[in-house]
């Protein structure tokens, strides 16, 4: 099996930096690029075995276009470490990459991975998803250690959807906790949110079982139960009376659930999907309803059987 020796990471935020730390600890040469880097994008990528995309969803297409314009060949394996959905066409990060790099193997890295905990050396697990078994195995080997357990699967779509959608739910749970609604309400919210995630997965054709793995339920639980989650913090701060702008300034980092909630609301409206939690989050973020009204609306919905 091919062994990765050089990795190029695009993105120098908390997540990209944590991934760099994991790879360096495994002996790989790591180059890291951002828009403020002195090293050029071409020099960062040249002869690297892994190209790791760790920029925000909003910046992914632009960076991918810059890479494509360099015409550096198709030898490297892409690793998508971005979570979110593009607002045009509801494309996942790996699909955006595949559109531009059809000949390169593309993998997805996702799971319950709070960057601060991993950077502190606390144990964690993740998933490398790809339809290319060899590429997945190479990336798995590059990241795996006694503190970071890495699994593989063959459902990149479901893996990415789980990672993107849980951010929206984390905002909702943050609101719930910020309003001090208790453990019962939080548990009900997370459980019904999983039903919404499964509906979206079914719509896009993802495998149901993926959402009960690390990149689905695992990521959902981590993001919805930890104050380290940026999306959870956004919801919590909104419930405390802060504006969205103030909440985002306070966390000083990208909260992908904000844009993903709006994308999901559009999807639900256009395709007739029942996504009441995501819809309420989108309205709350756009300041069309208050946190209290959002909870009241969910509780007042028509009674029904418990069906996914």
Curated annotation (Swiss-Prot):
Enzyme Commission code: 1.1.1.94
Positions of the catalytic residues: 166
Molecular function, one GO term: glycerol-3-phosphate dehydrogenase [NAD(P)+] activity
GO cellular component: cytosol
Catalytic class of the enzyme: oxidoreductase
Binding-site residues for sn-glycerol 3-phosphate, renumbered to this chain: 83, 111, 166, 219, 229-231
Record's catalysed reaction(s): sn-glycerol 3-phosphate + NAD(+) = dihydroxyacetone phosphate + NADH + H(+); sn-glycerol 3-phosphate + NADP(+) = dihydroxyacetone phosphate + NADPH + H(+)
Cell location: Cytoplasm
Residues the record lists as binding NADPH: 15, 35-36, 83, 115, 230, 256
Pathway(s) it belongs to: Membrane lipid metabolism; glycerophospholipid metabolism
UniProt keyword list: Cytoplasm, Lipid biosynthesis, Lipid metabolism, NAD, NADP, Nucleotide-binding, Oxidoreductase, Phospholipid biosynthesis, Phospholipid metabolism
GO process annotations (BP): carbohydrate metabolic process; glycerol-3-phosphate biosynthetic process; glycerol-3-phosphate catabolic process; glycerophospholipid metabolic process; phospholipid biosynthetic process
Summary of the function given for this chain in its UniProt record: Catalyzes the reduction of the glycolytic intermediate dihydroxyacetone phosphate (DHAP) to sn-glycerol 3-phosphate (G3P), the key precursor for phospholipid synthesis.
Family to which the UniProt record says this protein belongs: Belongs to the NAD-dependent glycerol-3-phosphate dehydrogenase family.
The name this protein goes by in its record: Glycerol-3-phosphate dehydrogenase [NAD(P)+]
Organism: Synechococcus elongatus (strain ATCC 33912 / PCC 7942 / FACHB-805) (Anacystis nidulans R2)
